[in-house]
Amino acid sequence: SDQGSSAGVLSGNAQDAGDWAALPNAYLSWALNKDLYVGVGMGAPFGLVTEYNRDWIGSAHSIKFDIKTININPSIAWRVNEKVSLGFGLNWQRMEAEYVRRAGIVDLPAGAGGVLIPRPLSQSFATLDADDDSWGWNVGALFTVSDATKLGVSYRSKIKHELEGSLSVTGPNPVFNTVGSSGANATVELPDTFIFSVAHQLDPKWELLGDISWTGWSSVDKVDIMRSSGALAQTLDTDFQDTWRVALGANYQLNDAWKLKFGVAFDETPVKNPEKRLT
């Protein structure tokens, strides 16, 4: 608890920090001829939203984390022959981040005899708002092994975001609000991914699907939040590890108008242990 702060005791259950979110996805493609196709896709490959009450016990670590990405992916695909097709794409990606926590600022009220006594200002809050646009690429190949079986491989590159924005402090002390606020920046390298997939047409009704993917989350080792002066404001020690994901599924052609899809997946977490978990 925070007995000596101007806000009194910090306590309480964090409650449910998650909520519903909309994930935009759209895809279009055009055939230039029988062997050459172009297309464009839009999606949100990475995102996070957690928000707690401002008086919860972990508010000095995090009150709100809101990370959004939008990815636009123009691509081209070429059918080399009846057995092999190749694809290549560019990725324009926008990232927006908001991070709010209780500020680690110390007030210095005069105690007995005029002595300055440090005291946390738990009524003060620090907010980081930052964004960036960046580019990446992806490649893929599709192999027709037989009339019933197809294999696919794809790779999507890392995308390095150099986020720029502001770090603002709000609270009861206008001096600390002014001194604590500044421009800010942070660098985040979102991970690359490799996917191997297989599809097998079991019969006219059933199609079996499977894939295994690897994501290089170790690229997000830590995130340094820097002030525009060059001073370090905070380090987020993410220390993520690379992960694997395995998925199995099936499509069932109910009739000419309807296809039913089923699937299950096991996805590893990039967080090494509970002590490394970000709120």
Regions inferred by a protein language model and the residue ranges of each:
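Outer-membrane beta-barrel porins/channels
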Residues: Q3-N13, W20-T279
